[in-house]
């Protein structure tokens, strides 16, 4: 089976407030179809997403669609260089508690964010991922910005026993939460996801990233994705968790700007 490459442009996370940019023209139609299918199934999303706008625009074009939080507007399609690019922004008006009935937090984490993530990473079990998110946010709030907190759990992905661990990194200006997933008997084949709990303001520069190319034999086999690892603002992911880290989403305002610029890394997924 021929490998397909998905590109995620980390430069579009935070400034401007785009979720990510996909630059593989062949992948975009399938991806947008998944997003639309999810929206069609989620009636509660109508409170903060105009599903008709999505459906109408998705049928017309999939090129460079941008979803702006709070407004729900889609901007005019544009071509990024000679590549087809799709921009999505996580809508932050929905409360995390609305989705999981998690009363410990008022952080905004929407169903659409879950959908967008899972559209690209289809083999993550719903229950495991949601449990990760719920535990991560709740424990993060309870820890009151402690430097690091580890919470290992057991779960199953595609019938395989796995361990997943939530790690927190906090500084005065930026905070992240990383969730590590790995097979119990293959700890080196580990997949981590990292997302900031506090996002940059619109006039700030991009969240800093660093280039990382996984060593041979230390990556999951399958499709390839280009991504950015967040290492700026004093944040350094735990050495055990730095492999295969993906910057996912921004949830709140950051308290200070960052001057670093992103460079891409790459990750292989099952």
What residue spans do the PLM features occupy?
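Acidic, small-residue rich beta-repeat scaffolds with periodic aromatic anchors
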Residues: 1-119, 201-270
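Long amphipathic alpha-helical scaffold segments
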Residues: 97-98, 102-155
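Charged, low-complexity intrinsically disordered segments and flexible loops
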Residues: 149-154, 200-206
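Eukaryotic scaffold repeat domains enriched in small/polar residues
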Residues: 151-159, 170, 230
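Structural core positions within WD40/WD-like beta-propeller blades
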Residues: 160-166
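Structural motif
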Residues: 172-180, 232-239
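Solvent-exposed strand-loop boundary residues in beta-sheet-rich modules
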Residues: 185-187
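Solvent-exposed serine/threonine-rich low-complexity stretches and specific carbohydrate-binding patches
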Residues: 190-200
